[in-house]
Structures are given as C-alpha cells and as structure tokens.
Amino acid sequence: MNTLKQYECTVIIDGGLQDDAIAAVMELVKKTVTDKGGVINNVLEVGRRKMAYLIRKTSIGYYAHIEFDAVPSVIAEIERVFRYEEAILRFLIIQLSSPLLEMRKRVEKYSVMLGSPEDQAEAEADADAKN
C-alpha cells in the first residue's frame, strides 16, 4: 500500500556553523525528503537556540521543523541520510495520527480566539458559519 502519510520532522543542526553552511544543510534536508518522493507542506526555521545540554560538545543548535507527506517505506531511507550528515546533531520524525491532527486544529482554533479582537470576531464568524 503506497498511500502518503503525514509526518513531522524536527532537526537540530550544529549552531556553530556559518549561515551559508546551515542553509546548505537545510537544502540537503529538503532535497532528501523530496528526492525520496515526499511532498513538503511547511517549513518552520526557528533559528539558533541554546540547548538544554551539550550534544557533541555543542551548546547552540539551529532548530528547524518540517511537515511533509511521504510513503512510510521511505522514512528509514530519510533517517539514514540524516544519520550520516555530521552537521545534524539530532532529528526526530513522527507520523501524524488522526488524534494529533484533530488536536492541532482545536489548538489553532482556540489560539485564534484568544488573539486580537479582529481575530476573535473572525473565528466566531467561522464557528457560526459551520453551525
């Protein structure tokens, strides 16, 4: 069965690298996902952050979060490529299940309602339109 499933990947890149080296690693990450047949939905580059503990004697990491769709059989191949890239300190790929997706929708709905008055009015109008 070759149906696409939704995944999230969080990557921590060595924060001591130059900006162009970090950009090259991010391109490698994106290229790896797309070359293996994945479709990238969203990329959030959080930036450099101090890590809670040292990883390979490094205290600063560049955090990135990628959401993509892929066939489950290629996840092991993507992980293998990430594992061999020295600039990637840590990574985690999880499959988004239905409960996680539903919870995300609820969080987005209520976070908009807690925002500005304009956002709150828009969210209430959307809720009324659904009912």
UniProtKB/Swiss-Prot annotation:
The keyword RNA-binding applies. Coiled coil: none annotated. Gene3D superfamilies: 3.30.70.60. GO terms for molecular function: small ribosomal subunit rRNA binding; structural constituent of ribosome. GO terms for biological process: translation. It comes from the Bacteria. The keyword rRNA-binding applies. It holds the Pfam family Ribosomal_S6. Signal peptide: none annotated. Keywords: Ribonucleoprotein, Ribosomal protein, RNA-binding, rRNA-binding. GO terms for cellular component: cytoplasm; ribonucleoprotein complex; ribosome. InterPro entries: Ribosomal_bS6, Ribosomal_bS6_sf, Ribosomal_S6_plastid/chlpt, Transl_elong_EF1B/ribsomal_bS6. Binds together with bS18 to 16S ribosomal RNA. HAMAP family: Ribosomal_bS6. NCBIfam families: S6 (TIGR00166). Belongs to the bacterial ribosomal protein bS6 family. This is Small ribosomal subunit protein bS6. It comes from Chlorobaculum tepidum (strain ATCC 49652 / DSM 12025 / NBRC 103806 / TLS) (Chlorobium tepidum).
